[in-house]
A protein has these predicted regions:
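Short helix-capping/linker segments at secondary-structure and domain boundaries
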Residues: 27, 36-38, 89-99
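Short, hydrophobic secondary-structure boundary micro-motifs
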Residues: 4-8, 42, 72, 118-123
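C-terminal end-helix/capping segment
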Residues: 99-122
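All-alpha amphipathic helical-bundle segments outside canonical DNA-binding/catalytic cores
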Residues: 8-14, 68-79
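GST-like domain detector, emphasizing the conserved glutathione-binding G-site
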Residues: 1-46
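Amphipathic alpha-helical packing segments from all-alpha helical-bundle domains
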Residues: 47-65
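Carbohydrate-binding/catalytic loop surfaces
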Residues: 125-129
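GST superfamily/GST-like fold recognition
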Residues: 73-94
Length: 129
């Protein structure tokens, strides 16, 4: 079958690896956010926050080094996962990652213009036609 899939057979394991790294970015970004916002300042753990931040930034730089794997003509689940992880990181933490990752930064600027990404922003309603 020539039907397109979100999980391409030829790149299945590369795709799953990229998804796992994106999931790790999200987990660390959420943990960092919880530590910074839900825990009283005098009980926060600076070393834990630093570990979360380092894991996030190292993972994003790893993706930048594998950038060519994200540049396929059809939309794949690894692209969606990475875009969501980068967008959330920018929203809740920092966009400083973009300084060392110009390819990912430019790619994210393009992918976030797509309707499916715009429609999932907080507070946005989208009509499907």
């Amino acid at each position: 079958s020539n039907k397109e899939t979100l999980y391409p057979k030829k790149r299945y394991w590369e795709c799953m690896t990229m998804i796992s790294v994106a999931n790790g970015i999200m987990e660390n970004a959420v943990n960092r956010f919880i530590e910074m916002s839900a825990i009283p300042e005098n009980e926060q753990r600076p070393k834990a926050i630093s570990r979360y931040e380092n894991k996030i930034l190292r993972s994003i730089e790893w993706i930048e080094n594998k950038f060519e794997e994200l540049t396929s003509d059809e939309m794949t689940m690894d692209q969606i996962s990475v875009a969501c992880a980068l967008d959330y990181t920018t929203f809740r933490y920092t966009k400083d990652w973009s300084i060392n990752c110009p390819n990912l930064n430019q790619w994210l600027e393009q992918i976030t213009k797509l309707d499916f990404m715009k429609s999932t922003l907080p507070g946005v309603s989208f009509k499907y036609e």
